[in-house]
């Protein structure tokens, strides 16, 4: 390469650098000018926006000030109106006080005038009394002088004469008053009883000793009986109820005098029929479950009864005992219905006489509570009822009402008399009771009572309408020979103490169970 060529290359390079510099400078100046213009435009826009915001803020401030001014003026007007009203009320009160003061002044003037008049009259009366006393003394002296009798002697003569004349009239008036009082008392008593009876509408209850369980088909009867009768025998043994399986289509009859046992057997048999699995172990399970259900139902009946009658605050155990009356009858009359009826009647009569109706209802509801206890507890239902009421701290009037409603004790309150009257009314109404059914049930209860009075007896059941009594004994207390002796002793005692038609079969059952579990 020649020096000329190198020189030319250097010159061209320098020329290119100079041209590039001027081009970049021109471009940079153009960009700076554009940026300056944009900045000026942005600044101008910002100024315009700031001015607009300023104007808008001023307008809003003016509106706010105007609104506040209007609200303040409105509040001032309201306060002025309220002050004006208060001022008017104060003026009205001042006027009323002025009028009252004027009235008080007038009354004070009238009272002063009357007081002055009364003082004058009092003075005049005292003067007249003095004159009358003086005249009486003068007349007495004159009479004593004329009759030659002293004042006391004359007074005694007059009193004796008046006493003789009035004694006969007093006796007649006393007799007439007594007769009128008796007539009025009888009339009022009849009126109170009629009102109470009209206001208390009760059902005529007639309890039976059988229950019917419907079956889905007649094939179920064979399953209930079981192989060699083991199912029906287990159910009868556990419940003490007779199962009558006859030609009645799709039905089994449960017969027994104890309604609680009968209801337990009915529920258990219903569950077994619905479940379909009928065997001794399942029967025992269902009977136990049914007993718990009956216990729950008894408690619910007690609570429902206290709610319907309006008696509150009873002890929970007493409520459960009250519910047992649902399954008790007296001469065919349901005892719970009878107790409710007595409570209503006693409460109505107490209201008519102005006595405590709530306490009368309480006493009426609990008057037969002793009938809920089984015959295992000795004593009459009155004695048991008094013991229960005392145990659960009932009111003394309630305890006396229970003790006196059959005349065993003297009633100490009107409520006790009303409870006895209500008890008689409820029992005496037509159709309320049946003597035959009650005697039959008592005979069955006596059968069980005699059987369970012997040592070693676990439980007993009177079945077959009282023609058989089955006695379950404890196998560890009585052996086979003693079981025969026990049957003879019970048979002899039944013959000595009971009157009954036909024959009574005494069956003593001694059962030993051995249970093991394979693991």
Curated annotation (Swiss-Prot):
Coiled coil: none
Source organism superkingdom: Bacteria
Assigned EC number: 3.1.-.-
Residues annotated as domain KH: 209-272
GO CC annotation: plasma membrane
One GO MF term attached to the UniProt entry: RNA endonuclease activity
Membrane topology: Single-pass membrane protein
Keywords: Cell membrane, Endonuclease, Hydrolase, Membrane, Nuclease, RNA-binding, Transmembrane, Transmembrane helix
Residue stretches spanning the membrane: 3-23
Keyword Ribosomal protein: no
Compartment(s) where it occurs, according to its Swiss-Prot or TrEMBL record: Cell membrane
Domain (HD): residue spans on this chain: 335-428
Main location: membrane
Family: Belongs to the RNase Y family.
PANTHER family reported for this sequence: RIBONUCLEASE Y
Official protein name in the record: Ribonuclease Y
Provenance organism: Bacillus velezensis (strain DSM 23117 / BGSC 10A6 / LMG 26770 / FZB42) (Bacillus amyloliquefaciens subsp. plantarum)
Protein encoded by which gene: rny
